[in-house]
UniProtKB/Swiss-Prot annotation:
UniProt lineage: Bacteria, Pseudomonadati, Pseudomonadota, Betaproteobacteria, Burkholderiales
Organism from which the protein derives: Ralstonia nicotianae (strain ATCC BAA-1114 / GMI1000) (Ralstonia solanacearum)
Top-rank EC class of the record's enzyme: isomerase
PROSITE patterns: CHAPERONINS_CPN60
Compartment list: Cytoplasm
This protein's name: Chaperonin GroEL
Keywords attached to this entry: ATP-binding, Chaperone, Cytoplasm, Isomerase, Nucleotide-binding
Length: 547
């Protein structure tokens, strides 16, 4: 086992604070509309240019082990905030640095770190309550666009794209971000439910130009097993043929005689049909078939519920306004399912999301909610170079997370003003003793810091601006991008409540852990001695025997 370096008290804390400051100083230059870029070296390819706090934090690894511990703890603040709220990483880092800096002064003066922590926790809990009270729900598309624009470093076109996407697929719909092929950003919207299974035979294609199968007003047959015997299908096919409407078959597989018969009927124009495999695997396949059934107002024909193919009637089949099937995807548009049943199903899947333990399961469940609730939108990011594309794509993803957070918990005035207003409301808070009061004071001081940093990055005098904003009321604040004072909500400078709340909670959590640290254990660097010179090869005598 490697030897350890054990450092106690102020010496340990001082080294960790140095690490905190190195990381926080690198991250905080990116804060606000006039924040600067940070260039990150890559081991291969060109460097990455970013204004995203968490991307900068993740790159920082310090040589000194104790400094690195401090830096890694603040990196955790940025990562946690990014994971929970999707934005606010730089704000969280600035808050954490301030709480650590102020807190260390009190610890050095001999105050009890545990009481300081209790005071900090009390102040943060009170501030979060006040933030929730001053928060207002996002109601308009314009507000969503403004939140997106602020999070994307004041890029209004990104905010507008996200608002447009949310308009089209609903606030529950899935919005994904991909690399575009042109210089402009594009928005592709897939309405209805789309799943990644295409036609089982190209002979079903009835639109040769687009190479797709289009079925108008079809019945939808859902079966959870393989279909290989046409006899099982005949009763349903006859009923559908009498109704004179097309049929989409979604089953585990359709093969052999059954597939051949469907193809022949299709070519001869006797019955317009198409067959696709059911999406997913195992239990997920059953769940997705059930989703399609609820969306189309049909039933999954399964032996478990006492239904068989031979006895299936038109009442068991789902219906849709249109179905489009490509080589790799099937889209069901405007299913005939009951809106109440769909809503109940969405609630049920949401409950499963709450209980899901793995990120993969959660992501798949969220996709199912989106497919049931609205649709899928894809924002294709356009840029001139790959470096610009990466940077812009990261900003679009940030903005997307921020708008989701705004929809979830509402919005507050941006530009660090919400924290100042919450601070004013809790300024009378008292702890159980003087040390707890000092903990409360630490948080009150830290809540000014984001505004100070935004103003500093904009090149103005922080103390003057903070004093002016404190003198104002409500949403009155400083718009750093224009250099004007006024109602920030009207100016469109908004922050999601969830982002501001999460930043404060995570910063206080990690910073107070650091204040209560009294010993740090780090590995000592190993002295790797240079390897010895290799000896000559044995058995090589003189050259006498060669004569």
């Amino acid at each position: 086992m490697a030897a350890k370096d054990v450092v106690f008290g102020d010496a340990a804390r001082a080294k960790m604070v140095e690490g905190v400051n190195i990381l926080a100083n690198a991250v905080k230059v990116t804060l606000g509309p006039k924040g600067r870029n940070v260039v990150l070296e890559r081991s291969f390819g060109g460097p990455t240019v970013t204004k995203d706090g968490v991307s900068v934090a993740k790159e920082i690894e310090l040589k000194d082990k104790l400094q690195n511990m401090g830096a890694q703890m603040v990196k955790e603040v940025a990562s946690k905030t990014s994971d929970n709220a999707g934005d606010g990483t730089t704000t969280a880092t600035v808050l954490a640095q301030s709480i650590v800096r102020e807190g260390m002064k009190y610890v050095a003066a001999g105050m009890n770190p545990m009481d300081l922590k209790r005071g900090i926790d009390k102040a943060v809990a009170a501030a979060v309550e006040e933030l929730k009270k001053i928060s207002k729900p996002t109601t308009t598309s314009k507000e969503i666009a403004q939140v997106g624009a602020i999070s994307a470093n004041s890029d209004e076109s990104i905010g507008a794209r996200i608002a447009e996407a949310m308009d089209k697929v609903g606030k529950e719909g899935v919005i994904t971000v991909e690399d575009g092929k042109s210089l402009e950003d594009e928005l592709d919207v897939v309405e209805g439910m789309q799943f990644d299974r295409g036609y089982l035979s190209p002979y079903f294609i009835n639109n040769p130009e687009k190479q797709v199968v289009q079925l108008d007003n079809p019945f939808v047959l859902l079966f959870d097993k393989k279909i290989s015997n046409i006899r099982d299908l005949l009763p349903v096919l006859e009923q559908v043929a009498k109704a004179g409407r097309p049929l989409l078959i979604v089953a585990e597989d359709v093969e052999g005689e059954a597939l051949a018969t469907l193809v022949v009927n299709n070519i001869r124009g006797i019955l317009k049909t198409a067959a696709v495999k059911a999406p997913g695997f195992g239990d997920r396949r059953k769940a997705m078939l059930e989703d399609i059934a609820i969306l189309t107002g049909g039933q999954v024909i399964a032996e478990e519920v006492g239904l068989t193919l031979e006895k299936a009637t038109l009442n068991d089949l789902g219906q849709a306004k249109r179905v489009e099937i490509g080589k790799e995807n099937t889209t069901i548009i405007d299913g005939a399912g009951d809106a109440r049943n769909i809503e109940a199903r969405v609630k049920q899947v949401r409950a499963q999301i709450e209980e899901a333990t793995s990120d993969y399961d959660r992501e798949k469940l969220q996709e199912r909610v989106a497919k049931l609730a609205g649709g899928v939108a894809v924002i294709k990011v356009g840029a001139a170079t790959e470096v610009e594309m990466k940077e812009k794509k990261a900003r679009v993803e940030d903005a997307l997370h921020a708008t989701r957070a705004a929809v979830e918990e509402g919005i507050v005035a941006g530009g660090g003003v919400a924290l100042l207003r919450a601070r004013a409301l809790i300024s009378g808070l008292k702890g159980a003793n003087a040390d707890q009061d000092a903990g409360i004071k630490i948080v009150l001081r830290a809540m000014e810091e984001p505004l100070r940093q935004i103003v500093t990055n904009a090149g103005d005098e922080a103390s003057v601006v903070v004093a002016n904003v404190i003198a104002g009321k409500g949403n009155y604040g400083y718009n750093a991008s224009t250099g004007e004072y006024g109602d920030l909500v009207e100016m469109g400078v908004l922050d999601p409540t969830k982002v501001t709340r999460t930043a404060l909670q995570n910063a206080a959590s990690v910073a107070s852990l650091m204040l209560t640290t009294d010993c740090a254990v780090a590995e000592l660097p190993k002295d790797d001695a240079a390897p010895a010179m290799p000896g000559g090869m044995g058995g090589m005598g003189g050259m006498d025997g060669m004569m």
